[in-house]
Amino acid sequence: MNDGGLSELLKLAGRRAVPDEHHMARARAAAHGEWKRLVRGRRRRRLLWVPAIAAAVATAVLAPAWFSSHPAQSAGHAQAVAMADIEVATLQMVTGAITVTPRNAEATRLTSAGRRLSTGDRVETAADSRAMFVLSGGTIVKVDRNTHVSLGRGVLTLDRGALYLDAGPQANDRDVVVQTPLARVSHLGTQFEVRLDGLAVRVLIREGQVEMDAGGGKKWKAVAGEAMRLTADLRPERDQIATYGPEWSWVAELPRPFTLEGSTLRAFLDWVSREQGWRWEYNDQSMRALFDIVQRGPIEGLTAKQALGMVLDANDLSFRETEGRLVIVRGR
């Protein structure tokens, strides 16, 4: 909608009408009469209800008068409110400098997190910057370099670059989709990357299942460990990929927030494994109780892999990683 259309909606909404003196007098008289009746009864008990009764009487008297005299303004106001932009995400991390441009406002250059993002906002990263935001329902969105993405209600429109979505068990907005020039990408409780590659769109699935819908009944699905590339002629190309390693290195540089203080070692290792695409395990059953030990100290500012060595060392443990398996062992 252009600025003119929005202005017309706001004009329709108008100011809230002020009730005339006649209706105000009726409301005051009704409330006062009710108050006197209550005083004659059991004073202590019933006086507690006077404010509520007075408010109810005033509403009953004034509301019909207002709505009957302003039907068009009521409808206009409701329509304007319904179309207003709403907050849908919070910026969690920024590396370098990014640009956020609201629908009807000037662009803002940001170098730190904390900004609330609304529908209509456009986020742009440069050649030396990345970002991460969390949607209101809990889904994590990581934004790679040289990316342009616009936020909507349940949809992220990708015009350039790449996004990584992590809709883990904590998320209740798993119906969020990524709209690209060629297809709409939806998922079922998963971790995946969507990247615009020239005139094609490429999807990498780390966990769960993803569907690409090009419209007209043309749909394709892929599961964890698969890559799918859709070209302009709508012919998908498939390949097998690893769910860990260099292909996902940029994702690991934007770690999902985790508070170590008060968490168990088990919860920490679950977080590390999810961020890195690993599966963690241990071979010595006598170590089992160690993973329930509550941890202390901050790890903010560290990637999952950086924090791993520090935390395990503090617990007299170490690890080895091979082919996506993170094996925890005793000793440093």
What positions do the PLM features span?
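Glycine- and acidic-residue-biased ligand/ion/polar-headgroup-sensing regions
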Residues: 73-105, 119-121, 126-130, 145-147, ...
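Single-pass transmembrane signal-anchor helices and their membrane-water interface zones
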Residues: 22-35, 47-80
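Membrane-embedded segments
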Residues: 138-142
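Short, exposed beta-strand/loop patches in secreted or surface proteins that constitute
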Residues: 114-116, 149, 318-320
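N-terminal export/assembly leaders
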Residues: 98-108, 195, 235-332
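Short, Lys/Arg-rich N-terminal segment immediately upstream of the first membrane anchor
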Residues: 38-45
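Short, polar/charged, low-complexity connector loops/linkers at domain or secondary-structure junctions
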Residues: 99-113, 169-181, 185-186, 193-271
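A short, acidic loop/turn at secondary-structure junctions
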Residues: 1-32
